[in-house]
UniProtKB/Swiss-Prot annotation:
Keyword check for Transmembrane helix: yes
Positions of post-translational Phosphoserine modification: 297, 299
GO CC terms in record: cell periphery; fungal-type vacuole; Golgi apparatus; plasma membrane
Membrane topology recorded in Swiss-Prot or TrEMBL: Multi-pass membrane protein
Natural source organism: Schizosaccharomyces pombe (strain 972 / ATCC 24843) (Fission yeast)
Cytoplasmic side, ranges: 1-45, 116-118, 166-188, 246-335, 403-409, 460-474, 519-559
One Pfam family this sequence matches: Sugar_tr
Similarity comment: family membership: Belongs to the major facilitator superfamily. Sugar transporter (TC 2.A.1.1) family.
Protein name: Putative inorganic phosphate transporter C23D3.12
Ranges of compositional bias, category Polar residues: 291-305
Keywords: Membrane, Phosphate transport, Phosphoprotein, Transmembrane, Transmembrane helix, Transport
GO biological process, one term: monoatomic anion transport
Amino acid sequence: MNRLNPFSKSHSKNSNENNEVSLADVAESDTRRHWLGLTKREFKLMGFAGAGFFLDSYDLFIINLVSPIYEYLYWGGLEGKKPHYPSGIHGLVNAAANIGNVFGQILFGFMGDFFGRKFVYGKEMIVVIIATVLVIALPKSIPTPLGKMMWIFAWRWLLGLGIGGDYPMSATITSERSLLSRRGTLLSIVFSFQGFGTLAGAIVTIILLACFEKPLNQRGEYTKLEGVWRLQMGLALVPALLVLIPRLTMKESKSYEQSKALNKYTDNDTYIADDDEPKKDNQNVVEEKQINLTTSSDSHPTSTEDFGDKRASTVPTSENTSGFIEYFSQWHHFKHLLATAVSWFLLDIAFYGVNLNQSVILKAIGFSSGKNEYHTLMRGAIGNLIIAIAGYVPGYWFTVFLVEKLGRKWIQLQGLFITGLMFAILAGSWDTISTGGRFACFVIAQFFSNFGPNATTFLYPAEVFPARVRGTAHGLSAALGKCGAILASLLFNFLTSVIGYGNVMWIFCGCMWGAIFFTLLLPETKMRDADEIDREEVLRGGNGKTHQGRWSWYFNGIF
């Protein structure tokens, strides 16, 4: 059973066992399901991959709760005075981690395809740990507020670099270690840890403020906020250290091993073996050694006998960028990359525009006002907690339980439409709707963002692309998404001061509804094996298996 453990270092002596688990092993593992129907193997995978997303979310969104403290401490916002925190600097600090994300997602995604999942996984966590220590080590000797913000910006950029690496690597590793019928559920569980990270940020802030209540609220010693924000950010080191060693010692993905050991093809598609086997043309390879990695039911998962020793029916290796360029030079592949990237970009403009500025928005709608700075901070943290409990976390778990029933495409489409509708309601009635009404709209928008595109934009690149380009394609999609987050971070405070909150909500609405068109380009990936489709294209030509019938436009994607 060690072969079922993704973290085991044991190696089978049997050549077949080196390729894949047997039918008996899979059947045995699937009968021992525990919490949420997970096997022990899946539970470990969810823990180590999910803990990374818990940390990612905590680190990305804690700045939303720390920013008001920066206003009070460094920008003259104490004693009821209006802070002089420039909107450009404010936006830059908020965007720092997302800017780093872009570079991290592309860099680690490419390295994951080029060097292997094992070589890369865990290195991103080392970057996160180093960056977190440097952020909270902000020297008090830096004399100016601008200098302090530049220190924080620099190291939160590095933090974002590490966090960005976690997106493509965790998605790819989870996708490649999952049965087809469980893949969407497992990917959704991993991504749902983002909700717990956001929830934890609000809870930690409330606890820390309560611990500092006497000096802050009763004695007005607001210099103690230095300790509060450093603890808020520094506590992220706990999950980072817990998952570091398991990630560094994780075995290589079987799918990646197969893709690297695959046959190479010449320009005329002649088969070239990795050993001394004679060359054969594609048709002979298909006839003699055709394999099938997926079936229509769970009772027939991949077995060792499907592979054989020659590995003849697998896709070509991708040891350089030529394979990536060749794959996406075809429109029916490129449109999927275009759709995953642009829909993620449009989503993140609205999603991060709200989440990175949630405390500011709560203050604008009148929820987080208080009689002094302490009460304002506490009310802001409580508002974030309510939104996380009522909308953020439940949305993720609706996706977990329904993704294999409704499919990815339906969840993404309905989430985009309803979230856009909430922004339209806010935009059209911003000056007339009550505080409670605004708050309810934001809660509903958060729910359908997460029972919708925020989860599925993460799932799609992990499922729609084959293993040989999966890491890079996921990294590029996520990176363009983070460009949307950066845009929102940099422009939100400026735009709200120029055109008002209502018009900004119209922009968010347009982004959500605009993403609907790009979603229609995508196929439904439920029970879809991208590697099998890729093999059929390489060995036989054509577009691989597609859905036929009146709903083909939906299941295959338009154009």
